[in-house]
Amino acid sequence: MDYEFKKNTLDGSYHATFSMGHEIIGRWLIEEVGKDFEKMDTILSQIGALKNSTKEWRLLGDDLSLILQDHEAIIQANYLFSEEEEDFDEDMHFYDEESVSCCGFEDFELVLQAWQAFVTRF
């Protein structure tokens, strides 16, 4: 998984670009995490606690949520949790694939630590 973080010096906004299949992680960092260091620390603590566990932990966001389970971090659009998703036609399948992404705890932990370091610096 490749990614790049940037800050717009004109308006102070952050940008997180991720490789194909992981784009939603960048959106989640921008929209749901931002510069919330307490949230980042909580997530990192949960990853550490779940590394040798079969338990699940969820962080529900406004539009996107994080699920930690089975040694994977899953970022998912909240609308996918609803039963209404079955009502979407087959043309929406590709869009759904862009609305969920997962990676292992180790990779996700590195991404979150890199984001934390980036927003601390800038």
Swiss-Prot record:
Cleavable signal peptide: none
InterPro entries assigned: UPF0231
Name under which the protein is recorded: UPF0231 protein PBPRA3187
Similarity field: Belongs to the UPF0231 family.
